[in-house]
Amino acid sequence: MKSRYNPVLIAIIAIGLIVSLWLNYQRHEIEQRNDTVEMAMEYEGLEHIANWEGLSLNDVLAGFKKAGVTSLVVFDTTLEKLNNNGSIVAVTGEELLKGSALGGDGGKFAPVLSEGIVVPNAVYVTVGTSYDVLTEVVEDLYLRYGKDRLRIVNNEPQIIEILGNPMVITEENYDSKPGVMQAPLGLSTEEMRKAKAFGFNVIVRPMNYLPNDYDKIRSIFRRIDKSGANVTGYIGCGREVVGYPDYIAYMAHKLKKQNMTFGMVEHYTQLQFAAMDGLLPLAEHMDYRVARTYIIDKAEQRKLKMPEALRRWALTDEERNIRINYIKPFMIPQEGRDILELNLDYVSKIADDVQARGYKLGPAGVFSKNTADGKFAPYFPERAWLVPLAFAILAGGIMYLTLLFNFSKKIQYMLLLTGGIVASVTLLKFGGILTRQLLALIAATVFPVLSMTVIVELWEFCKKNTPNTLKIIISATWQLALAVILSLIGASFVAAVLGDSSFFLEIDIYKGVKLTFILPVLLISLWYMQRFNVLSKGQIGNIAVHLKNFFSTRITVKHVAFLGVLAFVAYIFVGRSGHTAGVPVPALEIKMRLFLEQMMYARPREKEFMIGHPAFYLAAFAAYKQAPRLWQMLLVVGATIGQGSLVQTFAHMRTPVIMSYIRAVDGYALGAVLGIIAVIAVSILLPYVQKWQRRFLEHE
């Protein structure tokens, strides 16, 4: 076995492994410090509950504060909302003219009616219960519409005319541009002050100004300062972040100056973020002071019962590094409880679950290096640390190629030196995001294969004395542990080479997910055909000869049937990967996942414990019992699927690295149990199958 693996390459891989473990330890410390979850609900959502139930808003706010909500989300207010709560009085020109035609005097708007200056396609605004609110409205209207569309048409009382479409849009037409009544104005000082009075922090969601300029952005922060509220974060609203497209850097500057965190809402597919123009540039200008934010999709929540929704939050915080739980209330009674009681219980249980997993409640945590002054700093490892990783990963790739093509040591070293220098230059000089992605792909595809080649060679070495079933099970158990450890070398490389704030937040993502599932299967198949002359009728030659013989095989009906089964398996295998899978998950499997989530710290992946690891045990059984090579090869391919899945888990950079390691161990434990059951079942059934086979052949 020693002659097949270059000890120099092994030494380089060992050095890289030490570096990767050090970098992953640093990452673990950063993830451990990021331990605060913000529990957020919308101010207007709680206001809606109060109105719906006929309760005091003060009582509702106090109840949700006690239940565990730490922050209220405040949007830009609108003329429609302020008119509904009586702070101002707003009416369309068309309504005034119709009222006048019916004999009405216009009330507060009588002066403009009497002068005959009412424009149908306009909105007229005057004071309601608050002069302060009217003052803010006038300020916001000038910022949003400018002097050309706005004029004061009366002084006592002050009446403002805004030209524009006054139509109120229903929910069915939400994608239309809102009219003047529903268009965003600015943040409500009144709402932010009320949030402060009840002990809440505030997350603001102002909409972008069209067009934008420095003063309009400054107006947002003047309003925040005026309120005196503790505003901890900003989440975009609409289709653009504030400052898009030309003032993103300035918006980031103001957010950082206010010590605010940028909340980025996870996409409902759980892959990256809800689309918004300027989202990623703002995150970069914020130096990745970003909190991943989770909201249950509105359409999905309508289908959920409260207990189903409840189980998601703490698990999401732990597995996907969510740090803002953006909770929308249930607006339909459930379980015989009104919406206030239902939602108070919902929030309280979320808070309890989050804290039970070791998190604190408060302003959202962020990924930050441990700086001397305690200030925020994004985590990007020193580029020099990536150089030994690059050489180690390339050494693994060259080791595999040597198994196929029998490279001399001279060629191995030339390939390593050339590839290592190119990778090092791109990493040191440019940061090499593409190089890091490529290195991660090599590590994720090659090391599971190398792991299985070691095990197969071990089987070849040990199978001369065919053991009984018990000894096979014992051997396969420690051999699977060895395979997992060897695959974890590649997993550690993946986690280390991609480890920085942008990947932790999933702003950058690993791009080779589908290839990581397919390539190990292809690579182990090529190696196995080369090593054991499978499908070549005993003819010895290089990989090209084996492939030529393979593609020269006469196709029969049984081949077509086999390929059909293989295509279906591949469709399920690849189609179930990623976040936009076209293959639905059966209800029984969903229940099994829920059970495993409750029973284990990190639910293992089905490809490991249901496919890969049981196949490993059966492959060991087949090897020791000297089954036909084709059957051995198919089982080894199945075992490689498990090892590849194990490594691919570490490419989910938003998942804490320690959880990925524990997931691998959990997968090993559960897979070993199923594998042992599979071997026992086969060993019991095999004599009957062989007996039936002999009878069948006798009758032929």
Where is each model-derived feature located?
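Functionally constrained cores in energy, signaling, and assembly domains
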Residues: 26-27, 195, 317, 479, ...
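Cytosolic-side membrane-insertion boundary helix
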Residues: 358-416
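Alpha-helical transmembrane segments of integral membrane proteins
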Residues: 2-23, 393-700
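Soluble extramembrane regions of membrane proteins in the secretory/endomembrane system
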Residues: 30-383
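Intrinsic disorder/low-complexity detector
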Residues: 1-32, 37, 51-94, 115, ...
